[in-house]
Amino acid sequence: MTAKLLYELVHEAARAHGDKRAVAFDSSIAARVSLTYDELIFMSDELTAQLRVSVQNHEGAIGLFCHPDVLLPVWIIGILQFPAAYLPLDPASPPQCSLRMINNCRLSFCLIQNELLHSAFSILISVEVCATFCSHRLTLIKIKSEQKENSQANDAPFSSAVTKNIQQGEPLAYILHTSGTTGLPKIVKVPHRCIVPNIIHLRSVFKMTPEDVVFLSSPLTFDPSVVEVFLALSSGACLLIVPSAVKKMPRRLAHVLFKRNTTTVLQATPTLVRRFGKVVLQEEVLSADSSLRILAFGGEPCPSLNLVKSWRQEGNRTHIYNLYGTTEVSCWASWYKVPDEHLCLEDITDAPVPLGEPMLDTVMEVRDETGHLVTEGEGQLFIGGQNRVCLLDDEETVVKGTMRATGDWVQVQNSNLYFLGRKDRLVKRFGQRVHLDALQQMIESFSGVEACAVNLSKDDRLLAFIVLTSGHAGAPLSSEIHHDKHLTQPSEISVSVSPKASPPSLRVTEGEIRHQLSKRLSSHSIPDMMVFIPALPLTSHGKIAIDELMKTCETQRQDKNKQAPQKDTASVRLKLQNLWKECLGLQDDVVVEENAHFMFSGGDSLQALRLFDDITVAMGTTSVGLLEVILDGSFSDLLSHIMTETHDDAVLPSKKRTADYSDSEASGKRQHKEMTTSSDTESPFVVPSLRRTMGFVVVRRAAEVFKWGFQKIPQGIFSDAPDKNYVTNNSVGNDTGLISNPSLELSKSSAVTNMADHLQAQEETLLASESPSSHGGVREDSTGVLPLALRVLWRSDTGRCVDASPMLLVAPDRTTVFIGSHSHRLQALDLSRGEVIWERILGDRLESSAAISSCGGLVAIGCYDRQMYFLDVSCGDTVWTFETGDVVKSSPTVDPKTGLVFAGSHDGHVYALNPLTKTCTWQHYCGGGAVFSSPCVHLSPRQLYCSSLGGHLHCLNPDSGKVLWKYSSSAPFFSSPHCSDSSVFIGSVNGHIIGISHSGNTLWDFSTDGPVFSSPCISSLTLLTNQPPSTTPSSSVTTSPNHIVTCGSHDGHVYCLNAQNGSLLWQFQTTGKVFSTPFVFSGALWGLRTLAAVCSTDGKVWVLDGETGIQKATLSLPGELFSSPVIWGSKLVVGCRNDYVYCLELTTQ
């Protein structure tokens, strides 16, 4: 091969492709700027000429202190043509590091990007400004000689080494230092003839064309950047450059690479690629239609084929390569292409990926500890070659063909080389060898593990830092690590995440990993401690910052018992500003603007993780979403997140709708709408004519069924036919009816309206068909009772946990499910098929359940961003928003008489909102504590009930907000109040379920063995006195209640109580805690009077006999359940913490 210089390769390409785009710079927030090859060469030649005028004495190297920029290749080529080696200095590095390089390399001149001149290392040394090159945005400085004279004596030989090699015809291309992975950082001087073979060989291996777009993923201080720059520019391709801050924002980076630019070649460390996350990898980076042609891993051990396969979407055609090399023999020494067919196999082995073949002009040898060659077995890898020789530190000359020890231990097997780990990463425990890197790769190969780092602590404890795959089925989501709502006993595995306790599901995951390891490894190789973290921190070169992990672990172990301070906005803002400035190294008098972005303010991934840790310890906020807000949000976003965050996970992009379990997938399309809250974007709405003329039904949790717009209440298909066996709330006016009771009897009647006929046709499994109209028609023995079962009809992916409960809008044309998610999404789904009718992305998380306005045209829902949203039912457009003083988790309630919408807020108030006039009619302070629960309106007597976490239950006049009476408890009320004709009922955190008369007198108090977060479900029922309802001691009650109260408790039971006196009718023990609210409904289709549906937090849905509490059906879902079930016909809808909304069907077996 004829030796060439790097810039000569670019000149050859420019002569053939002068008018093609050579380099593009995309900031992600402004228009892309670019240079053609002709412009690149012209500006490079111009800079070279200016340097030759300004630098009188011939220099071996010129420093380059800059950020990524569209002119970056111009600056590099301009220096190389001088001729001189370029020495990159990182503005993000501490000034002392730059000073060390300057002194050790005896640097005399440095080019500094103009905007960095004031912040450069000149504060530590004396410099002289030689020239300013305005068109190149550079300033040339000279480092005064006294600085070099004061440097250490052992640094002196370097300058002569540079000159000597140039005189010998060995011009240097660049000078940099190693990352320290192979030991103490070394200064490496790389001749052109050492790096040019890399460029030429990879250009051939990758089959480069002028149509390619190569991403500059590496910083200039990391030698793979040389390959990226000149691989593109020697092929006539385009080099894509982005700001350093964008590289640290995975989602934004993916958008820039594959949406704004069609990147075809990506060379990166596995850790950097992992930061995209599985969803982005599958849907953008390695999707079926991805523009990415080449993905080359290097700088770290190649991920397992199992892991790479899990990142790829079916149909992806990206070629995967494994590159190996060391900076001491810059840059790559070997390459291996993963056969495409290997990634398509059903069962991929856990075998490591080979290092592959030597690069052009490269020799690779494996030697044992005595220096003998190894042809089979383990040994240390040595690399070199006649031309692959660099100068290290103070070396002046090196013999051609010198072989450098890499410090990497490999295994030779059938002529293939397999990486085992760094020589210093082969440790002994209990007299046995442990390959730390091999252990790390093995853990990463496990299902549900996205990334891992393994290290040995000073006290010889083997630590594994693990990042779980978000949304992995069958294992806790990475977000679950950060829940603090239902934590149990402390565990050391959570130290890097939070000083709080660890969820049981996380301990299960640890147990699963340990079990898998125990089947493959001896006990000495199994980690002593597993630390689950939201993301691995990176060095500036994109490698795992293991030292930072160890420091973080130790710091949080020491601080894990610290108490979080009071979260008032002023103190949190001040504390956050201080932490922000400390992490960025800013002066105390620096003002942190509300729109300041951490990464754009100079932060990096290590500093982001440090800020995450500091906030975790100082403020007790533990969500994985916290790290994402730090990476891609403003200071204001971060403050808002901390103030509102309590336990849930972060926002991730919504995945595609999952196919039905039992039916073929329906291809419903989503309508994504960005958040709009200002009045300028509020849109008028028109109530659909069918709902306006024929009425509609709203079904909510706790078996609340609202019927609107009827001349008379249809009795054939709705709840509680108004006969002597049922208690029905009075209708309001002639065309609005409210029934707050569940479907206990669904009978056909001549009074069924046209609306009812439409609904009957819509609901195939409606229980109205041929059912008896009174209890007398239901068999009293068991012969008519059919065995029941639950099956999944469909599920819809919301992108994050679903704690909200569904709300159903039953209209003549279809039944729509409305439900929100912690992903900020509100989905409108077709009940029959699960298709997404529309979807809105609101300003923050949604834990509130929705309500429908009295006109039927608006859906109202509260949001973590403090807003109450009123959206057009038909399309999701914003009609009005009302801002409260804090997070809104309370579910709104609609007054059937006035149409006012009542909702609570964490600011402690209840608001009466009029969506038609877009005004707040009144607001009421509930005595202290956030209003988490939902208000309850009762028509006769006309009263509104609201409760707070301060333990206050207030009875108000719904028209004016005037207090009628108050009830106080020593424990908070998370439970929402619900009413019967004579009483209001509520559960308390002290474990009590209380019945209170409408005049405020306590009627009874039932005690459970755990906190009650569940809300009471009130239903009408007449029990036969000759039928024993339960075998429990308290079931000997012979009174026939008009209403029953069904409620869950954290003691794991569902309780059914007599609403008159609070006596126990029956109780049922679930297998988990009961947070959700039961739903009581008709069982006529199955030969039963009533059924009760309830969910336990362990993921189980239960269907019980409403009269006896006997289990009739159950189904386990793959996630925790805090959402309450809602039933219409035979369909049950509920949200799950595995990100999905489920529709189940209750069928006969």
From Swiss-Prot:
Segment forming the signal sequence: none
Modified residues (O-(pantetheine 4'-phosphoryl)serine): S605
InterPro entries tied to this protein: AASDH_AMP, AMP-bd_C_sf, AMP-binding_CS, AMP-dep_synth/lig_dom, ANL_N_sf, Beta-ala_Activ/Resist, PP-bd_ACP, PQQ_b-propeller_rpt
Gene Ontology molecular functions: acid-thiol ligase activity; ATP binding
Presence of keyword Repeat: no
Domain Carrier, first and last residues per copy: 570-646
Sites where the protein binds ATP: T178, S179, G180, T181, T182, G183, L184, P185, K186, D408, R422, K543
The keyword Lipid metabolism appears for this protein: yes
EC number: 6.2.1.-
SUPFAM superfamilies for the chain: Acetyl-CoA synthetase-like, Quinoprotein alcohol dehydrogenase-like
Keyword annotations from UniProtKB, A to Z: ATP-binding, Fatty acid metabolism, Ligase, Lipid metabolism, Nucleotide-binding, Phosphopantetheine, Phosphoprotein
Annotated region described as Disordered, given as residue ranges: 653-683
Gene Ontology terms describing biological process: amino acid activation for nonribosomal peptide biosynthetic process; fatty acid metabolic process
Family: Belongs to the ATP-dependent AMP-binding enzyme family.
Function: Covalently binds beta-alanine in an ATP-dependent manner to form a thioester bond with its phosphopantetheine group and transfers it to an, as yet, unknown acceptor. May be required for a post-translational protein modification or for post-transcriptional modification of an RNA.
Name by which UniProt lists this protein: Beta-alanine-activating enzyme
